[in-house]
Amino acid sequence: MSKKSSPNLRDSKCLKFLKNSSKNTMKSYLQAIKKYESFHGMTIEELVLEALDEQTRQVPPHLLKVIDRIEDFQNYLIEDGLVYGTIQTHLNKIKSIYRKNRVTLPYLEPLNSKRVKRNDVIEFKDILTKEELKKALPLMRLPVRARAMAMIQGGLSNEECEHLTLRSFIDELRVYHQKEDDISALEWLADETNPVIWITKLVRIKTGKPFYAILGAEAVNTIASAKLYEYELPSNHHTLPDKLLNVHKSTMNRICTQLNKRLGFGSAGGMYRFRPHALRKFHATYIGGSALSYEEHSLITNAEIDEMQGRGKTNVQDTYIKTNPIRQKVLYAKVMNNVSLWHEYDYQLIGDDVRVFLSDPSAENRKLKKEVKILSEELQKKKQASEKVKELRKTLGDDVFQEMISEILNAS
């Protein structure tokens, strides 16, 4: 095997069909191509031209070099110790390149799974625990910890974290902080005694479908603290980039690997236990209540968890069933303690919103609970009064009702 690769793979004529593909798709193809080129010591363009030449010359199937090349490459990947899924992905990408360049491939024997190394299935015991997360998170710099908390409490993927913005964070939470300038808003949101849930619209990377991402109070506190930390950095000159989680995903991967080794968390399913995607799995496993409590109020269904992480709806369901963000927020408030690491929270429905507060029995929180209760009762009374007015108007008719209103206003 000699090393040779195309100087500018992305510009290769063979990859024109990938022009409008996502970054992830392009990355997946490039990984397979580089291995294929390196193994054969030829560029992908040379390999495709060779196959097209054989096709033009009508070489019999049993003498085709392209078949030998693909099968030899498959054997190399097996001997290299790659797992079944990775080998299958690489092979499918290479075959796809040939076919997209009008090379007709004859029947190829499917990959024999018995020849391939298989990783152990990841079980519940392999999922990170709250105690393990509480050991690892304080060892991260604040901006890195903020990204981790978005995955832990929001179930976001490493890629989805890239699309959160400071502007959305400030504006969508303005109803709570009610501050005019960004720094004052961040200071309020960074205060642990001001817990709020943030719900924001994102697009799931895999499917391209929008969904409502929900981040818990601890994630909001940490993100706000991280932005204040960034604001004070000399290199930022007291400015803030609009990218909310200002840590590159490759940096996140590297730091998680370092911490996994440092803390001795080991591996599961052939991968480190402490890695970005494992934080998303923690959210999916724990938020359903399966790890902590079997009380009815702390349990939600698998379908509801799927919807929180942007999965689950078919195209038909997505056409007819529209997600109510308020319902999603209430649902999250019910189970937020399942993915909270340092605090316990209570929640209260107020009109069309849900407010959360620390459940610590301090004087300040008792006062807050009392205020929330009074406000909730007042809103309920107004709602009942509004319903009675509507009923009266329906009974009397619009004309009589308007006359009564005019008389009342004139009398006052």
Language-model region placement:
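Catalytic-site neighborhood detector that most strongly recognizes the C-terminal catalytic loop/helix
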Residues: 309-364
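Alpha-helix N-cap/helix-start motif at helix boundaries, enriched for small hydrophobics
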Residues: 29, 94, 147-148, 159-164, ...
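Active-site/catalytic core of tyrosine-dependent DNA strand-transfer enzymes
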Residues: 214-271, 282-283, 289
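N-terminal core-binding DNA-recognition domain of tyrosine recombinases/integrases
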Residues: 12-24, 30-122
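DNA breakage-rejoining catalytic core of tyrosine-based enzymes
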Residues: 116-135, 189, 207-218, 234
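Short, polar N-cap/turn motifs at the start of nucleic acid-interacting alpha helices
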Residues: 170-171, 272-273, 293-324, 329
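Conserved tyrosine-mediated DNA breakage-rejoining catalytic core shared by Y-recombinases
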Residues: 164-222
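Basic, Lys/Arg- and aromatic-enriched nucleic-acid-binding interface segment
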Residues: 130-162
